[in-house]
Amino acid sequence: MSKLTPESEERLAWLLEPENPSVRYWTLRDILERPEDDPDVCKTRDAIARQPLVQELFARQHPEGHWGDDPAKPYTAEGTLGALSLLHLLGVRPDERTRAGCNSLLRFCQHEGGGFSLTQTRRSGIFPCTTGEHLPMLVHWGLGDDPRVRRAFEFVVADMSADDALDCGRYQHRDCLWGAIAALNGLAVLPAAMRSRQSRQVVRRLADRLLDAKYDFQGEHKRWLTFGVPRVWDLLSALLALAAHGYARDPRFAPLLELVLAQQDERGRWRCGSVSRTWPLEKRNRPSKWVTLDALRLLTTVPKKSR
């Protein structure tokens, strides 16, 4: 069980410290449920734009909209995808610069069928994790109604409907659980008008894959208990994806939640286990505001008796 509730004053005060306006912003919005036009939220978001990292990221953007040396390679460490993902994580407001970046990303990595490819726009470069994971970011940047993004949603629903949808060829033809997390993340922001019986069936199938998986947290899945910044493929990511679709009340969810709760320290904080080498936001093996924020996001979805 959680040693502290999500509303714990000490923990919230730590997350609300002005030194990290991005964590402060998301705490105000997602934990305290302040509206976007709240004066404190607006002030904090203004502070986000003044952060040196945000200014540096935009300074590295090319006039054509992309990041990195080659617009056709958005998946490189300093490429377009990484920059847009980080700006999204930091809570930057959408503007013409982020729109230009999204246009570049869509131009150079979206296959004509709607999926996102690791190899320019080739179908062979599309894996279970490459499309769904980008959709929340694109919706954040205001492209939820863009026909190109709509096609990407349609692709995820159709692609994940196949019996072998999670076989990416890298795990001896076993299900790629990372792909399940990515697809669930994408379908969590599926526009209401696009939701259907088929999309609900896909969500149910993907959720069952994650909840019924035979995890080996002493062996193959040991790294799933190491929580990274930015968020990577781990147990916390899986539970957040499941919770976004209402599975926090599922009996299979509870024992996995206990493993996440067991990782907190005596003050109810979670450590950062891995960081980005290109844009490190925190230090490894230290109490992490970002990981703690995500853990609290998870706890807000869980019935109090389960914490």
Residue ranges and their predicted role:
Residues 1-307:
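Preference for long, amphipathic alpha-helical scaffolds in soluble/luminal domains
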